[in-house]
Amino acid sequence: MSLIEDARRGVVTEEMRIVAAAEGVTEDFVRRGVAEGHIVIPVSPYRRVKICGIGEGLRTKVNASIGTSTDMVDVDMEVEKVRQAERAGADTLMELSTGGDFLEIRRRVVEATTLSVGSVPLYQAFIEAARKRGAVVHMEPDDLFRITAEQAKLGTNFMAIHTGINYETMKRLQNQGRHGGLVSRGGAFMTAWMLHNEKENPLYSEFDYLLEILKEHEVTLSFGNGMRAGAVHDATDRAQVQELLINAELADKAHEQGVQTIIEGPGHIPVDEIQTNVVLQKRVTNRRPFYMLGPLVTDIAPGYDDRVAAIGAALSSSYGADFICYVTPAEHLALPTPEEVYEGVMSSRIAAHVGDMIKLKKRDADLEMGHARRDLDWERQFAVAMNPERARAIRDERMPADTDGCTMCGDYCALKIVGRHFNF
């Protein structure tokens, strides 16, 4: 019996109770959200997972993606990225390796954390085809489905699956063209395979079989956005919207079959199109959880893309996005270091909180900080801060002569001056 089927029968499971307690909502609110497909709770029958609810009415969650590349294969470094992501407060991880021993890397990552771990089975299937048969276009569909099941058994409990790339989607892309090209690795692999083999995407044509595998292993299906824009000038184009419509229809089918679903969204969107994208996604998918990569709101700030994405993520969250994939300062430049993973998670967590201040009216912590600053209560300020360690380190490094204030104002602290005359 899947979580959705339990929820439909009126059963409040332990996972639902945990989410309700963590989010400050009723157990029945969570149960109804799961039953209707507005909330997902990734679980795994193969390992202990820290329970995390994603969706409508819940705090915006942050994912940290890690993984090797063909140029950098260091499993110990990837495990350290897991630690840094957890230290920074990530809610979930995705393991997206494209180099090295896939089984060993994923096993080490899964063993290093209790967070939900996502994957993209398509990567492994295509790259193994290239290693064994000389090119990604020689991937065998049976291998793709086998790898999906194997990754689930290892403890991967949500998966990005590129079902929305089919002949109709490709036609839209070919007819329209793009300024920034096709930047999704999964989208590129599948498009190349389809064109070379003159066959439909097996994840689309054999979707019923895919659902059987995912349901058997209680995997949450995250519909991949293989046609997402890689430049702001391509945002909200026909190929992106076509893929969304296909994924929306398939999500209905998956939900009917008892498979939890998330819809992934675009990665580069100008500020004035973010609300349009969130509203469109929520409308056509029947309010399923929306997972945004960033989004990045400008293309000209490499080295600072964690900040660029935080702007987009804050707005996306405020309009109703439920799940944010972090972006690191190394985006578009290099594989991130553990330190950059930490920075990326922190930037996205700040953005998620800013969005929740609007979407959920969650402002109690900000009120507490305002009072602590008014009272020059530094310990309270550190306790409320999203990163107490960093805040304390900066202050300790530049401690003022008068320890009530700080070195920004020194003797002329506005709060101390006014405090002599007002009792706020």
UniProtKB/Swiss-Prot annotation:
Any one GO MF annotation of this record: carbon-carbon lyase activity
Pathway: Cofactor biosynthesis; thiamine diphosphate biosynthesis
Similarity comment: family membership: Belongs to the ThiC family.
Annotated residues for binding of substrate: 94, 123, 162, 184-186, 225-228, 264, 291
EC number: 4.1.99.17
Top enzyme class: lyase
Protein known as: Phosphomethylpyrimidine synthase
Origin superkingdom: Archaea
Matches recorded under NCBIfam families: PRK13352.1, thiC
Alphabetic keyword roster: 4Fe-4S, Iron, Iron-sulfur, Lyase, Metal-binding, S-adenosyl-L-methionine, Thiamine biosynthesis, Zinc
Cofactor (UniProt): [4Fe-4S] cluster
Amino-acid positions noted as binding Zn(2+) in the UniProt annotation, renumbered to this chain: 268, 332
InterPro entries the record matches: ThiC, ThiC/Bza_core_dom, ThiC/BzaA/B
Protein function: Catalyzes the synthesis of the hydroxymethylpyrimidine phosphate (HMP-P) moiety of thiamine from aminoimidazole ribotide (AIR) in a radical S-adenosyl-L-methionine (SAM)-dependent reaction.
GO terms (BP aspect): thiamine biosynthetic process; thiamine diphosphate biosynthetic process
Binding site for [4Fe-4S] cluster: 406, 409, 413
Catalytic activity: 5-amino-1-(5-phospho-beta-D-ribosyl)imidazole + S-adenosyl-L-methionine = 4-amino-2-methyl-5-(phosphooxymethyl)pyrimidine + CO + 5'-deoxyadenosine + formate + L-methionine + 3 H(+)
Cofactor note: Binds 1 [4Fe-4S] cluster per subunit. The cluster is coordinated with 3 cysteines and an exchangeable S-adenosyl-L-methionine.
Keyword presence, Plastid: no
